[in-house]
């Protein structure tokens, strides 16, 4: 198992949790983004810069990830594609997407896109709360413990 991060929009606090977990466990952690992302100096932590462009980082994660890996992303279509590959997907708020929940998430996303396209202001997501940060860290620990890392 290794961890892939859709790092273009990943909150700094989530990256810090991931850096600590990778340092503690030795698991391979790769942050994928279309710009340089600084990472701690460690053999198991790296940053991968891809070309700028729509979904280029997402496509790289789909290409490189394997069944059993963990991807950190809030991107619902990316999560749906990864779940089909049997890759686990955890969003930065601590929600683990599953086959059972991803279809509903896609429907909500599509509905919100339709509302925005019709001119209705929907706003963006709220900043991460302390509870969500804690839930992310706890869920990550559960996943790593289950994988015995």
From Swiss-Prot:
It holds the Pfam family DUF188. InterPro entries: UPF0178. NCBIfam families: PRK00124.1. Belongs to the UPF0178 family. This is UPF0178 protein VF_0601.
């Amino acid at each position: 198992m290794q961890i892939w991060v859709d790092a273009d929009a990943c909150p700094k606090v989530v990256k810090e949790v991931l850096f600590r977990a990778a340092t503690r466990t030795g698991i391979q952690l790769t942050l994928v983004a279309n710009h340089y992302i600084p990472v701690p100096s460690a053999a198991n932590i790296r940053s991968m810069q891809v070309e700028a462009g729509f979904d280029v980082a997402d496509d790289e994660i789909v290409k490189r990830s394997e069944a059993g890996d963990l991807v950190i992303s809030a991107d619902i279509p990316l999560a749906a594609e990864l779940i089909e590959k049997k890759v686990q997907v955890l969003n930065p708020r601590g929600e683990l997407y599953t086959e059972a929940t991803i279809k509903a998430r896609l429907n909500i996303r599509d509905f919100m896109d339709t509302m925005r396209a019709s001119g209705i202001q929907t706003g963006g997501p709220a900043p991460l709360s302390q509870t969500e940060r804690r839930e992310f860290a706890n869920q990550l620990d559960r996943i790593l413990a289950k994988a015995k890392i």
